[in-house]
């Protein structure tokens, strides 16, 4: 009867073949025999949709009981979707030659709601190889506590001026997280260890870190969002009092927002930004491998990977490269290259110059649109605008006679792409053009990425 209070009867589930019942039931804000609450009904539906385990549009069906009109039975009618993804990537640069990678991710592992991720990356030159494994449990023992464990191993040829041979990195750790006040705001802490070993140097590095973070996430789908915000702020404290021989603090802020511009959710605008700052602690210098370098499909497209790397990066040195002929002790002549900005610097001043930055900022704006009126079109277009830069220590700019960039002094690029959605996944073709090309730089760059579902 309209106006009378109603109570929840049975909460039933249909259509879950792989997903276990308790994984679904723990997302219900409504409970059996409690007073019906429209807000809790909406939140329950949002929780199920945001899992990413089911086709979008999950609705809890309500049906009154015969002879008990104040009792409502609820039915979650589900249709499971693919929860495994793979991503393959291939590229080329003067630094690493041909490179590639493969990432496999299985969500809802064995129907438990857990996620397992495996990845491998390689490069033709510089002996680059990297392997990662991560296991995530979003609801430990069906509680609101989330946890993850991870481990990785990588090998790469030292490309810095230190020439320390092959660098082997072994890292491992775990994290725990919990909601703060409401569902979308979470606090988490990660404890990690990293051992960086060199074949041609005895100065091995051992990092022990703790990273508290606050995250807000309201996106409506974990893989293909069309609305919502995802943002986080974290502080990564390395060294004292956690051990190791590196003292370092890093601040990181990330922001991403999605807007659906039409009713069918096919015209989507995405804005993203990130900022990072490295701070020396005590007398421990910032390791070269931890300094910021940007460029490529994940930051500023149209640039080679990590080619934007401060006033003494490879890209900047090419701009000021000059040649001179020197005669060695045996009387043989050799042609040497040098940076014209460093010719009057002393040995101690040269040691202050380092590739990479201690701060970074990256901004991305994307518009994804269909090529036809059919909302199920499998071909989507993309236009984008990227901007970003890194800054090094002020002393480096002074030594090189350069002006330190302001926050909004950025390298910029724009471009377009096509994404082909197939039953096996998404093919991405993206072309980026530099909007501020320098004399020695190529004007553009094409990149191809394969990502998919299984």
Name each model feature, range by range:
Residues 2-4:
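Extended, domain-scale alpha-helical bundle/helix-rich regions
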Residues 18, 29, 34-232, 249-251, ...:
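Gram-negative/organellar outer-membrane beta-barrel architecture
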Residues 268, 388-414:
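Outer-membrane beta-barrel transmembrane domain signature
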Residues 20-25:
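N-terminal export/assembly leaders
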Residues 72, 262-394:
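Extracytoplasmic gating/loop element in the C-terminal half of outer-membrane beta-barrel translocons
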Residues 366-368, 411-419:
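Short glycine-rich, acidic/polar surface loops and turns
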Residues 241-242, 250:
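Acidic, glycine-rich flexible loop/linker segments
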Residues 144, 179, 381, 386-388, ...:
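Flexible, small/polar- and glycine-enriched "cap/hinge" segments at structural transition points
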């Amino acid at each position: 009867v309209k106006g009378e209070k109603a109570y929840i009867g049975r909460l039933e589930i249909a259509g879950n073949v792989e997903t276990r019942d308790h994984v679904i039931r723990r997302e219900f804000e409504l409970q059996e025999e409690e007073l019906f609450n429209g807000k809790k009904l909406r939140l329950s539906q949002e929780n199920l949709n945001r899992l990413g385990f089911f086709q979008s549009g999950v609705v809890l069906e309500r049906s009154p009981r015969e002879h008990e009109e104040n009792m409502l039975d609820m039915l979650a009618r589900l249709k499971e979707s693919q929860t495994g993804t793979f991503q393959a990537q291939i590229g080329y640069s003067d630094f690493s030659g041909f490179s590639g990678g493969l990432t496999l991710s299985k969500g809802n592992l064995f129907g438990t709601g857990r996620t397992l991720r495996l990845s491998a990356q390689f490069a033709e030159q510089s002996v680059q190889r990297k392997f990662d494994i991560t296991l995530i449990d979003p609801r430990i023992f069906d509680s609101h506590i989330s946890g993850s464990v991870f481990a990785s191993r990588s090998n790469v040829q030292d490309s810095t001026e230190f020439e320390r041979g092959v660098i082997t990195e072994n890292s491992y750790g775990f994290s725990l997280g919990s909601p703060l006040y409401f569902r979308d705001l979470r606090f988490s802490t990660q404890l990690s260890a990293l051992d960086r070993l060199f074949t041609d140097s005895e100065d091995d590095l051992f990092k022990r870190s703790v990273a508290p973070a606050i995250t807000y996430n309201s996106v409506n789908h974990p893989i293909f969002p069309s609305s919502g915000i995802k943002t986080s702020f974290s502080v990564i404290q390395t060294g004292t009092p956690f051990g190791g021989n590196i003292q370092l603090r890093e601040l990181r802020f990330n922001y991403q927002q999605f807007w659906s511009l039409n009713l069918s959710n096919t015209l989507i605008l995405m804005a993203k930004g990130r900022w990072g700052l490295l701070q020396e602690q005590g007398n421990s210098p910032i390791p070269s491998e931890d300094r910021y370098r940007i460029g490529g499909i994940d930051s500023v497209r149209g640039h080679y990977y990590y080619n934007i790397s401060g006033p003494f990066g490879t890209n900047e040195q090419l701009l000021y490269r000059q040649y001179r002929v020197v005669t060695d002790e045996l009387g043989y002549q050799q042609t040497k290259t040098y940076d014209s900005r460093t010719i009057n610097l002393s040995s101690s001043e040269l040691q202050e110059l380092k590739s990479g930055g201690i701060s970074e900022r990256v901004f991305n704006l994307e518009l994804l649109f269909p090529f036809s009126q059919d909302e199920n079109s499998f071909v989507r277009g993309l236009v984008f605008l990227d901007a970003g830069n890194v800054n090094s220590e002020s002393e480096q700019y002074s030594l090189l006679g350069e002006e330190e960039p302001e926050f909004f002094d950025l390298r910029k690029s724009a471009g377009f792409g096509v994404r082909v959605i197939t039953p096996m996944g998404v093919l991405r073709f993206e072309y980026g053009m530099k909007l501020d090309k320098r004399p020695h730089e190529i004007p553009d760059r094409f990149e191809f990425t394969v990502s998919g579902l299984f």
